[in-house]
Amino acid sequence: MEKLQNHSGEDSVRVFRPADAEETTVCWQMAMENMSTPTALILSRQNIKNLPAGNNYTLARKGAYIVKDSESDYDVILVASGSEVASCIAGAELLKADNIKVRIVSAPSEGLFRRQSDEYQAEVLPKKAKIFGLTAGLPITLQGLVGANGTVFGLNSFGFSAPYKVLDEKLGFTAENVYKQVKDFLVR
């Protein structure tokens, strides 16, 4: 994961870290279409839940997109890639119970997202929004997406070995920790 920072936003390698099986299919199609650079598909071995029903997976072609939005204006945006998107979705349900309105953004490819128009980028991740990033990598890997008003929960050490549910609990990749981290972030 830490090596991905060497390539995020760069043209040297197209990196995809999809959130579920359907998003993986779109990323695989883009990998097969990409004839100009190597492509890295960063996949999980976990049994990850699918994104919410009705999701427009073709928007993954833009690198980042809204997978779930609040019914009215949001209080915070949660952004992640890969398996962490599922943790954000679960955490958003807990936040909703506290009347915190959440937008969830899946960002399978920051490099592709940065190639979109400024208008599209601002529509998905407005610069003045409070944005919380969740990553199983170094926090710096999402810093460019969360911006100056945001924060990232991530890891600074690697190499742990245990069943993924044990690691998620120990390292904080649970709905409960997303809830806690976001609540703390919103009162800063």
For every predicted segment, state its role:
Residues 1-2, 8-10, 24, 32-188:
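Thiamine diphosphate
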Residues 16-20:
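Active-site nucleophile and cofactor-binding loops and adjacent substrate-binding regions
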Residues 29:
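Hydrophobic alpha-helical positions that pack around
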